[in-house]
């Protein structure tokens, strides 16, 4: 299963640098000079291999220079490209209460009282911490802080995320 670790937001300057939105918790290991990246063009386009020439932080994103991308025109052509890794290549997680995003996505969300709320659509990484974006059967989105006080139990074996929501968290009105 392919996992997105970054996405090209736009070109930066005239020398081929790219502004990359990071979608991995370990950018220092994935986006380093000499690293090989697998990229896929937007809307199911062709895959292509890239080699990182340089990288530097840029306001919560990265400025990336790739081998063979030497000017703004080449950089603009990569807008929307996503960088991928295969989930089988990820190291196992040693901590019992830590998960890869893809392990949580699709799990059933149920309250401690046994009420089904919906399914985890995605995990959002914010400055304040992680949020579970839960899609209800009606199609609404509920954002659940992914903290032990609200999410006391995750069972990958049972395909279940159990939540103990504070008053008002599940109110959609």
From Swiss-Prot:
The PRC barrel domain binds ribosomal protein uS19. Keywords: Chaperone, Cytoplasm, Ribosome biogenesis, rRNA processing. One of its GO terms (cellular component) is cytoplasm. Gene3D superfamilies: PRC-barrel domain, RimM. Residues 96-169 form the PRC barrel domain. It is found in: Cytoplasm. GO terms for biological process: ribosomal small subunit biogenesis; rRNA processing. This is Ribosome maturation factor RimM. An accessory protein needed during the final step in the assembly of 30S ribosomal subunit, possibly for assembly of the head region. Essential for efficient processing of 16S rRNA. May be needed both before and after RbfA during the maturation of 16S rRNA. It has affinity for free ribosomal 30S subunits but not for 70S ribosomes. Belongs to the RimM family. GO terms for molecular function: ribosome binding. It comes from the Bacteria. It comes from Mycobacterium sp. (strain KMS). Pfam families: PRC_RimM, RimM. Binds ribosomal protein uS19.
